[in-house]
């Protein structure tokens, strides 16, 4: 399942994502979870997938990552995850994607030292996301 989740989330970052983003960035809902303490930004994607980001990640980049995940999960854009089995699995694994400022950052170290779950489907870094260049790896 981990390979499926990684593929599900990471491949479309190279593809085209929707340009209109309708997600709200919220405060980290789990500030007492040691693995998640470095993150100040949070987006719930369709009730089954979470995105956590460091404060240095722009809101545009966080929303873009959420839009890519949502487009994969809800390709017909009706607000419902297209495959209920995937939705159930994502919920049961507490699926999430952390976005770090850089590889080897203190937030990344804190996260991986303290994270004990199975829900990390992909890891993103700030320089890998460019909302203005959908379909291309950000630089």
Predicted features and spans:
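Sec-dependent N-terminal signal peptides
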Residues: 4-13
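Boundary at the C-terminal end of the N-terminal hydrophobic targeting segment
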Residues: 15-17
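Ser/Thr/Asn(+Pro)-rich, low-complexity disordered segments
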Residues: 27-43, 61
